[in-house]
Amino acid sequence: MTTALTEQNAQQAATAGRVVRVIGAVVDVEFPRGELPALYNALTAEVTLESVAKTVVLEVAQHLGDNLIRTIAMAPTDGMVRGATVTDTGKPISVPVGDVVKGHVFNALGDCLDVPGLGRDGEQWGIHREPPSFDQLEGKTEILETGIKVIDLLTPYVKGGKIGLFGGAGVGKTVLIQEMITRIAREFSGTSVFAGVGERTREGTDLFLEMEEMGVLQDTALVFGQMDEPPGVRMRVALSGLTMAEYFRDVQNQDVLLFIDNIFRFTQAGSEVSTLLGRMPSAVGYQPTLADEMGVLQERITSTKGRSITSLQAVYVPADDYTDPAPATTFAHLDATTELDRSIASKGIYPAVNPLTSTSRILEPSIVGERHYEVSQRVIGILQKNKELQDIIAILGMDELSEEDKITVARARRLERFLGQNFFVAEKFTGLPGSYVPLADTIDAFERICNGDFDHYPEQAFNGLGGLDDVEAAYKKLTGK
């Protein structure tokens, strides 16, 4: 949204129209000739239902001709009637920005849910904004070191990149998200923004309470548009959260972590809105503008010179079909994918990241370095060989393997366990303190395991630990040496 356009819209503020048709979340409004509000402008209408008055926000979606516009309601339209007065605010939906949003919960319209009215008298930004221009973009690629071994070694994250997080219920997706928020706050003194898109209200409440308990809420802004809200809200809440993150990046020069849970619900809401607006559906019933809508969101998530927004996006895959247009369109924008696997979680290994199916575009020697790349490939090779041998082991048993294969399987089992790690947010469940393992220590540790330096250590010595110091301590405890 350009400055000139915003000023022009502001001049049209307080222009009044009237409702001519209401069909669920779609409201058609008539305005005086020459005074039509711009696309994406926010309109307000006063609605009374059962003697209770409320303000319903509408967003302009189409100009129909004959002074009519079609809008999408951002709240239930119960009680709205034909002839009701609608006022043009002269600007798009705007949300509070700056330090005032930290430690609080907002909805997609920028209203604070835990402290009503908070931030409305301060600076506000419209949620429809242009992505950074080409000359503002950061040219170099930099690793975001998380201190989580399996991620840093095998699926390194890009600072200012977009990471897809795949996982079903109960495999540790929410725990990994909370852990990343905690690490950004503790290790980098950074700010996190969490956008809950179309997920359960209970999950949002749990997240808020657990973050408050961990002491990281004061560094995090939360924006929710849950699954019981109209599709317009679910479609815009990701943009609201992103706008708050952009302020921290562009004005306060901070590195920001943006969580979107779930990016599929953003696509799903767009499909609902598209159908409501009468557009012809595309493949599998999705909106014809799917790629464009995804691009508008994703292109704003990037690194500019000296600061970045790194996004961790939970991705639901319908019926585990990765060719479905929704996840397929998302994949095109991702720099790394982290898949949480139920079979790994069932072994008690957390985070349950599958190292053989998770990927990162920066895992190459020119970016991470020759040694990092070589060690990662050795680890993946041993784990892959172990997977191939499982059928033979299941049928014939370990005794039928060659000595070389027996060594490979033994090292793979140690590697699998060592890829697990104790988390800060899980201390109350495990009784073990969380650990941050520097990347250099991670590379050294896995290289030594691959070399066979710890073949005489029992597998139990590698369970859910941090670095090699923890392994040594566990070995002494197990053996009494």
UniProtKB/Swiss-Prot annotation:
PROSITE patterns (alphabetical): ATPASE_ALPHA_BETA
Alphabetized GO MF terms: ATP binding; ATP hydrolysis activity; proton-transporting ATP synthase activity, rotational mechanism
InterPro entries cross-referenced by the UniProt entry: AAA+_ATPase, ATP-synt_VA_C, ATP_synth_F1_bsu, ATPase_a/bsu_AS, ATPase_alpha/beta_chains, ATPase_F1/V1/A1_a/bsu_N, ATPase_F1/V1/A1_a/bsu_N_sf, ATPase_F1/V1/A1_a/bsu_nucl-bd
Residues the record lists as binding ATP: 167-174
Xref: Gene3D superfamilies: 2.40.10.170, Bovine Mitochondrial F1-atpase, Atp Synthase Beta Chain, Chain D, domain 3, P-loop containing nucleotide triphosphate hydrolases
Superkingdom classification of source: Bacteria
Catalytic reactions on record: ATP + H2O + 4 H(+)(in) = ADP + phosphate + 5 H(+)(out)
Membrane topology term: Peripheral membrane protein
Similarity comment: Belongs to the ATPase alpha/beta chains family.
Assembly and oligomerization: F-type ATPases have 2 components, CF(1) - the catalytic core - and CF(0) - the membrane proton channel. CF(1) has five subunits: alpha(3), beta(3), gamma(1), delta(1), epsilon(1). CF(0) has three main subunits: a(1), b(2) and c(9-12). The alpha and beta chains form an alternating ring which encloses part of the gamma chain. CF(1) is attached to CF(0) by a central stalk formed by the gamma and epsilon chains, while a peripheral stalk is formed by the delta and b chains.
Functional summary from the UniProt entry: Produces ATP from ADP in the presence of a proton gradient across the membrane. The catalytic sites are hosted primarily by the beta subunits.
Protein name: ATP synthase subunit beta
Organism from which the protein derives: Corynebacterium efficiens (strain DSM 44549 / YS-314 / AJ 12310 / JCM 11189 / NBRC 100395)
Organismal lineage: Bacteria, Bacillati, Actinomycetota, Actinomycetes, Mycobacteriales
Gene that encodes it: atpD
